[in-house]
Amino acid sequence: MRATWKGVISFGLVSIPVRLYSATQERDVAFHQVRRSDGSRIRYRRVAEADGDEVNYADIAKGYELPDGETVVLTDEDFANLPLSTSRAIDVLEFVPLEQVDPIYFAKSYYVEPDRTGAKPYVLLRDALAASGRVALVKIALRQREQLATLRVRGGVFVLETMVWPDEVRQPDFPFLEEDVAVRPQELSVAASLIHTLAADFDPTRYTDNYREALQAVIDAKVAGREVVASPGGPASEAVGDLMAALRASIAAARAGRPGEAAVAGGAAVAGGAAVADGDAGPAAAGVTDEGPDDKASDDKASDDKASDGRRGGRTSSVKGASSAPGTRSTARKTPSSTRSTAKTNAATKTPPAKTSAAKASAAKTSAAKATSSRTAPKTAPRTPTSKTPPTRRSA
């Protein structure tokens, strides 16, 4: 590694000579700008605006433009002679708890290495700082600007974390912060269950840069002359509709992807016995199912017979069709599930009614009797297709 800064740590009357090294490096794939047709590199020249002449890098300085358009030129010597104690020193201001420093202030990390002559005071300060459980708040001048920073211990060495100034932290000004967004306790409970399901110890080595790997694979395929196969796109982003359903599905997916976690079908259960019902349970949750009619009425059924079936609302069963085959069907206001199953079986095997004018006439004359029968105890009513007299009612 190449040192990016040299100076001292100023700690009271103690000065520790140190060097800074960048603690991180980006692994992005590097590209050059080229001409599309032949891949020829695009080059830029430093040209003076006044005369168009190319300027050597050694002749370039920094300029500050005044409001009237005039420019003040500053050289490297001007920056080197700044009247700042932090230009070549890390000034320790105070020692603060790390948890009180909001991570939003952190900018860049540097390793701090001691010079040969400063190894002992370096180790002394390192061990004392580690035992205190605090971090040193310091000031340092880097790249022509003074910065706040923290000094902490990591892996036996000091790590300098540069920080932004408080007036450089932007404040969120979002409209929803002014709105009264209500969150129900049931929703909060399910969200907490999802967090519990995904809880883990921090281990960044488990994750990789999938985009960079895919990009490198495309480059390698281009070099080898292979065809680049486009990967299928991810799921399209959709607006959140049923929030509770989305949370439950997320819990089920998270548990299914973890060993030892039972997958929750449809997100019906949550960790720790937290309630998942949102108070608006559908018919299935309450044990209620939609029940259609046992069978469809014949096209030849009389209109008054249809009206009588509509009043029953599917809750009772009666003999349908005036010319049905003789038989009995139980009727009741509250039919158990076993009875309903039997009734449906009977309905499935019912013979079609005979299409005779006599049967239609019989059905018209006996509609009142059938309506009364549907509201009373179970009865059977054998029908004689050719008879015009009301059928004899017998007990089941």
UniProtKB/Swiss-Prot annotation:
Biological processes, Gene Ontology terms: DNA recombination; double-strand break repair via nonhomologous end joining
Low complexity bias spans: 278-288, 337-396
Region Disordered, residue ranges: 278-396
Basic and acidic residues: compositionally biased ranges: 294-312
Compositional bias (Polar residues): 315-336
Record GO terms (molecular function): double-stranded DNA binding
Subunit structure: Homodimer. Interacts with LigD.
Protein name per UniProt: Non-homologous end joining protein Ku
Organism (species): Frankia casuarinae (strain DSM 45818 / CECT 9043 / HFP020203 / CcI3)
Organism placement in taxonomy: Bacteria, Bacillati, Actinomycetota, Actinomycetes, Frankiales
